[in-house]
Regions:
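PLP-dependent amino-acid enzyme catalytic core
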Residues: 1-82
Length: 84
């Protein structure tokens, strides 16, 4: 599949069945969030925050966004912000 923008790859991550860890008759699935561009579930959160802020006109061109995190949320926000 070809995407027009890196942000289009966020979400719709696959669910993978874990076969060897579950008791008989129990199915365990995990979401493979590492398929997101910054390898984190926080990519989805950050994209949603930015999209909602844009819809509400809370972001303007040239505005500085400050996020008090050193974790995956900050990475996801940085990724989303450079593509708006």
């Amino acid at each position: 599949m070809i995407y027009e923008d890196i942000l289009d790859t966020i979400g719709n991550t696959p669910a993978i069945k874990i076969k060897n860890l579950s008791p008989e008759g129990i199915n365990i699935y995990v979401k493979a969030e590492f398929y997101n561009p910054a390898s984190s579930v926080k990519d989805r959160l950050a994209k949603n925050i930015i999209e909602e802020a844009e819809k509400k006109s809370l972001l303007t061109p040239g505005q500085t966004v400050v996020e008090a995190t050193s974790g995956n949320t900050g990475v996801g926000l940085a990724l989303s912000l450079i593509h708006i």
